[in-house]
């Protein structure tokens, strides 16, 4: 399964913020430049992450963004489920769009559904804290001050 850029960027933003010193504010420009991602895309991602409570946005002079909850409370499987818009990895997963003639007897959709559930189950085992255990290395690569 391939994650959308939206989910990829969401996870990267969370990793970036988790690698920051606790309470430190970051900004969209800084994250966009670090990852070479469009600021416009990141604004949408960060807005949604804020709605979900994963990030806190502080407006105005001296404002910025930071994690809205502890990294150990941010489950990766949950983030993926909330940022991916479509888990229909094959046509037959969507009853409204399914035109496959063998769908009623096909075993493939059951195998793929099992694989999708296993994929999500693995993601459910991890939190954001798990992804930043090597925080010092991440900070160096992101060129953050320790």
UniProtKB/Swiss-Prot annotation:
Keyword Lyase: no
Keywords, in A-Z order: 2Fe-2S, Activator, DNA-binding, Iron, Iron-sulfur, Metal-binding, Repressor, Transcription, Transcription regulation
One term under GO cellular component: cytosol
Listed Pfam families: Rrf2
GO terms of molecular function: 2 iron, 2 sulfur cluster binding; DNA binding; DNA-binding transcription factor activity; metal ion binding
DNA-binding region: 28-51
Matches recorded under InterPro entries: TR_Rrf2-type_CS, Tscrpt_reg_Rrf2, WH-like_DNA-bd_sf, WH_DNA-bd_sf
Gene3D superfamilies: Winged helix-like DNA-binding domain superfamily/Winged helix DNA-binding domain
The keyword Transcription is annotated on this UniProt entry: yes
Cofactor details (free text): Binds 1 [2Fe-2S] cluster per subunit.
Obligatory cofactor(s): [2Fe-2S] cluster
Amino acids binding [2Fe-2S] cluster: 92, 100, 106
GO biological process, one term: regulation of DNA-templated transcription
Domain HTH rrf2-type, residue spans: 2-133
Function: Nitric oxide-responsive transcriptional regulator. It represses the expression of flavohemoprotein hmp and the nitrite reductase nasD. Probably plays a role in the up-regulation of the resDE regulon in the presence of nitric oxide.
Protein name (database record): HTH-type transcriptional regulator NsrR
Originating organism: Bacillus subtilis (strain 168)
